[in-house]
């Protein structure tokens, strides 16, 4: 039975980025447990899906590539692409993991975690591990919100090119909803999009709320080319039924529409459905309760990292946001372990805007 200082669950952007940062702070006894292979969720993106944040090798000027998980790497440099596919990003993660010689156990499913007096016992499908600290980096992509009996969730689509030309309904009015509408419309389909709210024209400057320029630009271009996309706002879906070869979508207003094709659900994800999250964290109404250290309120030395972290209304749903917490948490571990502070390392992360120790600084405000 292996005992390690740190166990990270999940070998995605957050898990690999955290492991690299821990090494920079002198914590090297780290393992990563991954149920599939490195970049598992990215490999399951629809083939046409791209990162909405652009990659550019701005490293060296205090602002690393927005999609980089470490200060000295850049997907733009490695792949010469600005908006990267899921498959390519997974390849980037593998390249980085190899470069930093991370200790990753693939095809290892965590089945249970129990607390002992001085450490945690992690049972998996391959072996049992002990760890003093646990970082949960499982994300939410494997837990789509599917509130209705019918509907294809965006995350379940392998390739939009497999859809025949026709009339489609998309439910959801943010990034994945508009991306689905764009992908189908550019192939000649007619799209009716229904949503209760949308970030399309939101005045909030925060890109976690407002539709990204990349999505907005693609949407505008395809509409200029004659695409037919009908947007319906303030519609809340109550139910979806299927009979007589038609999908019937009913809204809480009493209105309804029908479509011959199964509706596409761009309804987001729910990390609280993850059994690991349910076991280790207090959850209420799709919200994961965390301390100001992104630590579980149920167990000490168990942390949440990645896009699922929300703290003081700050949503860390982009890589450039959540990577800024890695060094803060690594520094916290050195303090708890009584290790000497690595001030040069801390300052280096601070200079590269990767040391977010105050969530009150996260408010996004633009005058024009």
From Swiss-Prot:
Its EC number is 1.-.-.-. Its cofactor is FAD. The keyword tRNA processing does not apply. GO terms for molecular function: flavin adenine dinucleotide binding; monooxygenase activity. Keywords: FAD, Flavoprotein, Monooxygenase, NADP, Oxidoreductase. FAD binds at residues 14, 34, 41, 52-53, 110, 307, 319. FAD-binding protein that may have monooxygenase activity using NADPH and/or NADH as an electron donor. This is Putative flavoprotein monooxygenase. The lineage of its organism: Bacteria, Bacillati, Bacillota, Bacilli, Bacillales.
